[in-house]
Amino acid sequence: MKNKTIITALTVIIASLITYFFVSIKKEYPQLYNIENDVISSVNKVNGLKIIPKIETLEDGKIKILTFNKVSNSISNAVKYANYLWKNEGYYIITNNNFGKENGKVELAKNSSENGKILKVNVNCYTNDSFSVVISLINGSLLLKNNISNN
């Protein structure tokens, strides 16, 4: 009887320790997205989201589609991410189609570290608590014009 009690107590302690270690293991969320030689801050880094997106990689890694599902306040998370890229990482807003509203989207771009390439980011808001980020490396370059004239 005494041996049975000791074995039961040890089993409970071991099971508790195993459960504690599995529960306390932190998931690693990406801090950066890589597209060839370029890096972009991740949504997880910018917004602190604890969601791992569905990731599709196309065109030999030159296009990444990240879909974030079951995100509360998905529109505000999408806006926060796009604003961060614009204000902190040197992206320019190329198009804005009702961004910040359901089914809205924004396209941002900047010159890649690779000559003759553009890094383009599309952030799309959806209606069902989700949003997507499409990152692509395309041929071209941004030529920015100063609209201020000196008269």
Label every model-predicted segment.
Residues K2-I6, L17-N151:
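An acidic-aromatic pocket/loop used at catalytic or ligand-binding sites
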Residues I7-I13:
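Sec-dependent N-terminal signal peptides
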